[in-house]
Amino acid sequence: MELDHSVVPVKDKEAYSKQIAHVMGWTFLGVRGSQGHVRVNDSLVLRFDDKDPNANRKASHYAFHVDAGEFDGILERAKAEGMTYGTNTREANMEWNDLHGGRRTFLHDLEGHSYELMEAASPPALD
């Protein structure tokens, strides 16, 4: 079983979809209806929806296992776009920490969503 897609509420589907696709190194597929579609990998599409741009939205959190080159590239593009990142979902200290033998940081966007980047995957079981 694989996750096919998830819908993320945003204020401007097209601008947001293009920016996050650029920063994360994903593919902007285009806009259909109230959603901007972004291909993350072969099996996952994120749909950024602005059906109700004035709605009281809750922030979402997404975690991605990335390699060292992806980690560095994403942070470089995020800084160029004016995005902040930090050692947790609330910190914008422009730092990363170590987790399970790899670097980890949290990108913060203007919508309140956070994107966790982890060089080491989550452990297979809780200790």
Model-predicted segments: where are they?
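Short aromatic/hydrophobic contact patches that present stacked aromatics
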Residues: 5-7, 37, 61-63, 104-106
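Short, charged/polar, Gly/Pro-enriched secondary-structure boundary elements
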Residues: 43-47, 55-56, 113
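Conserved beta-strand in the GNAT
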Residues: 46-48, 106, 116-118
